[in-house]
Structure formats: C-alpha cells, structure tokens
Amino acid sequence: MIRRITCMLFTLLWVLNSQSQEFGTHWITHPNRNDSSEVLFRHTYTTLQRPLQAFITFASIGHCKVYINERNISREIFYENKTAQGILLHTFDVTRYLRPDSNTIAVWYAPCPQALAYTPTAINKQLSLEYYGTKPDSTAFYHQADDTWTCSILEGSRISTDSTGHAMEVFDNRSYDHSWKATEQPMKNGEKPMRSGMLKVEHTYTTLPAFPYKGNFLKNVLSPISIYSDSLGTHFEFERTFRGSVRITLRGAKKGERLEINGLLYICSGEMDEQAFRRLTTSRQKTITIKGDRYFDKSQIQKVEGLEIY
C-alpha cells in the first residue's frame, strides 16, 4: 500500500512537471508515415545497475501496445486516445520488469481512423514517451523517445475502414516478427524515426490520479452456442452481444491463405497452429462470420472464442 501511494504521488508530481514542460510537444514518427500502416518502435537503455524505481509515461493519437523487456506494462489489451478534446497520458510503474544491465522499451503503434478524421495532424503524433525514475544512488534519470530510437513499418499489417466506416484490421502473419520486442534481435527494415514537434498542446489529461481511464481489459472469454454455414461463410453465434474481438485457433491452414473475420483480414503463416484475432481494435458483435479463399476449409477451425473487452 505504501509503495502504491508513493507511486501515485511520484506520478502526480512528475505529470505536473511534464505538463509545465509541455509534455507531448515532442513526438516521434516513422519517416515514411501514412494513414494506415502500423509501426514498431524500439530502444534499449543500458545501465550499470538496476534502477531503484522507474516509470513510463506515454501518449499517442493512435492505438498502441507498450512493452518493457518483452513484458506488457499493464493488463490492458491496447491503448487508445478516446477523446477528441485532448491527449491522454498513460503512466505506469515498470520497476518490477527492470533488468540490471539494459532495459528495452518497445511500442506497437497503429493509426486510429477516427482520430485522423478529427485531428488532421494526428499522423505526426505516433508516439511521445518518457522513461524516468531513480538510480540506486537516489539520483534521478530521465529519457525521452527521440531520433536515437529505431522504428519499422509492420509489413502487410494496417488499420483502415470498411465500407460502413468501421475499423478494419489487416494482419499478415507471414511477415510478423515475433522477436521484434527483444533486445538481441535487429529490427527488420529498421530506420531512425523523425522528430515531430508541436508548438502548443491543449487539454492534456493524465490517467493518474485525477482522470481515471476506462481501458481495454479482457473481462470474459465466451464460447459460441451455435454454428451454421451458408453461401456467406461459416457463422458462430454467441449467447449475447459483447464488445471485443474473437480469437480463432487454426490448424493446417496454408501459407498465404486469407480469412475474413468480422473486421479482420487475416493472412495465414502456414504454421501448424496459429491464432487469428484483432490486436488493436474492437467492435460489438453477437454473431461472427468466417469467410475464406479457395484454400479454406472449416475443418481448419479448432476453436472460436469471444474476447469481451471493455
């Protein structure tokens, strides 16, 4: 409890200081940015000793996942800026994930079509991040994401909108590098990000402690109650409507095989077992439809799970 109170007080003081320095005026973005590509960011900070305590504060106009030493910094599935009136700051104590020699921060960013609609410059606000805390000798340290980081466009994966205006994810599992968060592995097609400054930031909100953030947490895993097929595909119906995504476990799918699943276009890697699910978006649904190309056979579907996220 004492540690938690200390964390909150430290965070409050730091956020107030960050706002006084106009947190969010310094952003990084991929040099070949566009309004649909997903981007991976990564940087390793070397140390002589394990920091005594450390925090990460970050902001993004898009959707993102944040890791340190390959560990998700919280239980949230992903983060998103849910307000058109300001920029949300997310702050987390990452002390328990720290290593004594080096610490790698990795961020998976995806654009938000809605944000691009109400904020034309959102394409330049991919990531603003601060990593700070206390060294073993009780002195402070501070780092900010800048052009010393490495970034890479996630090939074959993007977020766009469908014909109805809803978000649609495209995920190509053939080109996804599962080791992209790791320190030891060079980032595929890595480049240095560009700095993208803002002269002024209005309405900056923090998630702690004054502005509680209703995040994207996994609440329940649901099972379908009925299955049927017709000319439109294979349908799985759940007992009730839920907000979230679905996770499809596949076996024996061919490399390059394409599946359409309620807002997701998934391209198979050809591994013996693989899972198709939306990683950075959600929607409300009660029935899902799986439609495949000529290589698809419904016997490839081993399991269907409804992931209720709110």
Give, region by region, the residue ranges found by the protein language model.
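Bacterial Sec-dependent N-terminal signal peptides
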Residues: M1-E22
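Extracellular/oxidizing-compartment recognition motifs
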Residues: Q21-Y310
